[in-house]
């Protein structure tokens, strides 16, 4: 770092050349103007220059990192690089950030009549501790995002100043926001909402159809997004896309999107070993689609789903590992029930109700609820945990039976612990239906048996009391082509 001190200079010119520069102007107490030129990246410290009113870096082509400016600095122009600075002035300011992907933070309450132009590029206007005063009859405030995909912090916007924001395409919801009506932003056409950090809860309303949520930060606070007319619609859609960066990074969102029937999630990002997490609250949810190549942990808040409609969670196109927990989904009464599909990675699915599951490729784990279901593991060494799916009724005619469609070598079937004996039972002439077959199979306590009936294979684990009971467990394996000669049973886990 180069330190320059001139106690008498009123104007300073810096030519940034070479690869990059770091300059400290501490002690140049009389400086009122600073001109920056050159093509090198420059990091500048000038925060203690209490008389510095103007910074003109419009001729600079390198990235300018100016830090927090002094409260006296009210005129700032930067050039074509990716520039970063924080405004600390409370008076009227004039800012032109030029071209480049610039980031400007407001660290103070700027006065009415201020003009901020972010210029060309994908720019961001963030809130620090500052706000923007509304226009008055003789002082018009204009905040212009300019060309490009520009983002503004929602915490800077209120009913009084919303129309002053021009040409912004994205609204950042990271900082706490209380029920902002985005329809008030009449001079901007929003294309996206963003979560870039981890500061607090936010609520926005009147979000237009087609606007999505981009998640690059880690925010566990609730982000409530009220899409316009979703409460009365029957086929409303919303999408969440993770686009965070950094190896071994974590990105998360907790979204409330009540009224949305169709939710799509893209679990993506730039970097290796990225882990994304999404929590969903949506009382109308019927279809949730997952794509992307990054790991995603998905869960739900209580009350999500509509009992009178079936629900499908379709992650079959995803190549990142999916961890899906349906514990808090509403119990679906529609005959279509709950369907879960996952993709080609090693996925884990935890169920709270009867479900149909196709786990795709990968070494997957399916954890059934007490209501059982029909489960397909797909290619890979899969684990089917049906230990909670007990018969539930001492009458075998009314017993719960879960189905595994593709149990094969390398897979694990986890049942109740019923001793380590696994043997075939031969059906007698007394067996005339499935109920009587189950009765015969459960005669002896603390053993697990298998038999074939009606073109399928059944496994029955007795709970320790002779005779079929509610605590026994029955599983149907689709088809009869199973070779149990080398099968092992230990602590309720059956391995082929």
Label each PLM-derived region with a short phrase.
Residues 1-496:
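Solvent-exposed, low-complexity segments and loops of surface/extracellular structural proteins
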């Amino acid at each position: 770092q180069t330190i320059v001190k001139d106690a008498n200079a009123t104007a300073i010119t810096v030519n940034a050349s070479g690869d990059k520069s770091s300059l400290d102007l501490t002690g140049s107490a009389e400086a009122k103007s600073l001109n920056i030129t050159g093509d090198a990246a420059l990091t500048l410290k000038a925060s203690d220059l209490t008389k510095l009113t103007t910074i003109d870096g419009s001729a600079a082509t390198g990235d300018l990192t100016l830090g927090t400016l002094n409260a006296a600095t009210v005129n700032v122009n930067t050039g074509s690089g990716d520039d970063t600075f924080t405004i600390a002035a409370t008076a009227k300011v004039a800012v032109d950030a030029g071209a480049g992907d610039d980031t400007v933070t407001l660290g103070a309450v700027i006065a009415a009549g201020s003009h901020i132009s972010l210029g060309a590029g994908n720019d961001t206007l963030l809130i620090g501790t500052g706000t923007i005063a509304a226009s008055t009859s003789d002082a018009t405030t204009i905040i212009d995002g300019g060309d490009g995909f520009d983002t503004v912090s929602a915490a800077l916007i209120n009913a009084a100043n919303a129309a002053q924001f021009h040409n912004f395409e994205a609204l950042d919801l990271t900082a706490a926001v209380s029920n902002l009506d985005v329809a008030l932003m009449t001079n901007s056409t929003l294309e996206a909402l963003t979560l870039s950090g981890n500061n607090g809860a936010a609520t926005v309303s009147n979000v237009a159809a087609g606007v999505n949520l981009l998640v690059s930060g880690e925010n566990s606070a609730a982000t409530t997004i009220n899409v316009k007319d979703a409460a009365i619609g029957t086929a409303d859609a919303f999408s969440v896309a993770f686009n965070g960066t950094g190896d071994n990074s974590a990105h998360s969102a907790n979204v409330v999107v009540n009224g949305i029937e169709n939710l799509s999630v893209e679990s993506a990002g730039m970097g290796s070993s990225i882990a994304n997490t999404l929590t969903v609250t949506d009382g109308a949810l019927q279809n949730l689609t997952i794509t992307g190549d990054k790991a995603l942990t998905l869960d739900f808040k209580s009350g999500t789903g509509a009992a009178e409609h079936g629900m499908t969670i379709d992650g079959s196109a995803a190549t990142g590992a999916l961890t899906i927990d349906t514990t808090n989904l509403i119990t679906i009464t529609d005959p279509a029930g709950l369907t879960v599909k996952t993709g080609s990675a090693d996925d884990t699915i935890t169920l709270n109700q009867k479900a149909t599951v196709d786990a795709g490729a990968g070494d997957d784990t399916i954890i059934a609820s007490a209501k059982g279901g029909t489960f397909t593991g797909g290619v890979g060494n899969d684990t089917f945990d049906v230990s909670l799916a007990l018969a539930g009724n001492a009458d075998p005619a009314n017993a719960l039976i879960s189905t595994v469609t593709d149990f094969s070598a390398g897979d694990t079937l986890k049942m109740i612990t019923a001793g380590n004996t696994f043997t075939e039972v031969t059906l007698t002439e007394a067996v005339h239906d499935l109920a009587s077959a189950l009765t015969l199979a459960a005669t002896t306590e603390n053993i697990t048996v298998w038999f074939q009936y009606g073109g399928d294979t059944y496994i029955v684990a007795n709970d320790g009391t002779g005779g079929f009971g509610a605590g026994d467990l029955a599983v149907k394996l689709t088809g009869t082509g199973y070779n149990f000669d080398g099968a092992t049973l230990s602590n309720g886990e059956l391995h082929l």
